């Protein structure tokens, strides 16, 4: 084995000693030992340095895309925001204008034209928050603004966050949304639903169906007169934003033939299941013969290359990504993760490509079947490490990329004690894995794609979102030391692929503008 990259998802390094930091509170003898023995530094994982708007926290999709590309990749969120800014005459100075102004986007306009021609409504659907991981509320506001200018009858289906934002921030986001509706005279909220239902990505189709039934058939668990009331009444039932049960609002008429839908999430993984339902691209176990109404469904970005749907911002796939370079060099590689992070070490790491490269193997370990991961904070880390170790010892791959999901997924629950347990569980498996890589003659690279468990907030106000704190980078030679190398400061995720290729003796392509982290 030549090299293995281990991604500790959500493992940030918080410089503030006055916060509840599950990473710092955890007993992590292996991580601490590797940091002391190896070549260590920190990486920046947010803002323009990973292709996001300035100050925006990073996330797993962005992180893995940058890692695999070996360069800063302008993210879809920034592409959409910059196009909106151009429509408003507010384009940022570094805007590359690769997309048309938002109000002139032909795919988005086609949804409006379809509804107008058929006497229908345009339905705007997506996560309503400023979390910036899956959506921006300003993108919805721009759609409402466009509908107002055209005089188009529009409604909004608001998915509440509480995961990348405060658990009860939805009340304010919905109030802001209703203010925009009032200002532009259209886009009233028809349903409110927590992302737990509307944005499941773990094949829990019964959750997706509950969101679908509220949007399409007006069959919600609850009814509210106004959007904000849907949130406040949910809080009174001790149910926070992420878990708000599908609620119909006002005189919602459902989704009807002749209507159009714009799904405005820019991140794909948690938008796929509901898109499958609405686009009639269904799994065999859907459990219903009922077909969705005949509508025009537009997605903000490409959610799946197999979906035959119009896309407002088509993918701008980077070429010469890590997996491709390894494949062309005749190297074998293995990608490993449990269910929650499997798309990230495959699709996103490969620059938005579903199909594996020649010589690329993939192993997925099922995530635990629990409602929330604080109930099983070790998740499937032991089984994942077992799978990786067996593969290394029996197949001897040239390269490995593995993701431990625990600090991120448990950090999102806001449960401090569970997050500490999650970090400790990962540290235990990290030790086993690094020893195996070294025994196989490989270099080990340890990093994170963003922070999360490094700031858990307070007991009364838990922090469930990602952080903008630096994340670790550690290099270990096969003998478990720095091997005479030092790690430079000021690195980003785009520098990881060039580092790995250099250690493997492979020339990096010109498109990889990142630079090696060790020398």
UniProtKB/Swiss-Prot annotation:
It holds the Pfam family iPGM_N. The keyword Manganese applies. It catalyses: (2R)-2-phosphoglycerate = (2R)-3-phosphoglycerate. Its EC number is 5.4.2.12. One of its GO terms (molecular function) is manganese ion binding. It is an enzyme of class 5 (isomerase). Gene3D superfamilies: Alkaline Phosphatase, subunit A, BPG-independent phosphoglycerate mutase, domain B. Substrate binds at residues 134, 163-164, 195, 201, 267-270, 341. The keyword Lipoprotein does not apply. The active site is at residue 60. PANTHER family: 2,3-BISPHOSPHOGLYCERATE-INDEPENDENT PHOSPHOGLYCERATE MUTASE. HAMAP family: GpmI. This is 2,3-bisphosphoglycerate-independent phosphoglycerate mutase. It comes from Haloarcula marismortui (strain ATCC 43049 / DSM 3752 / JCM 8966 / VKM B-1809) (Halobacterium marismortui). The lineage of its organism: Archaea, Methanobacteriati, Methanobacteriota, Stenosarchaea group, Halobacteria. The gene is gpmI.
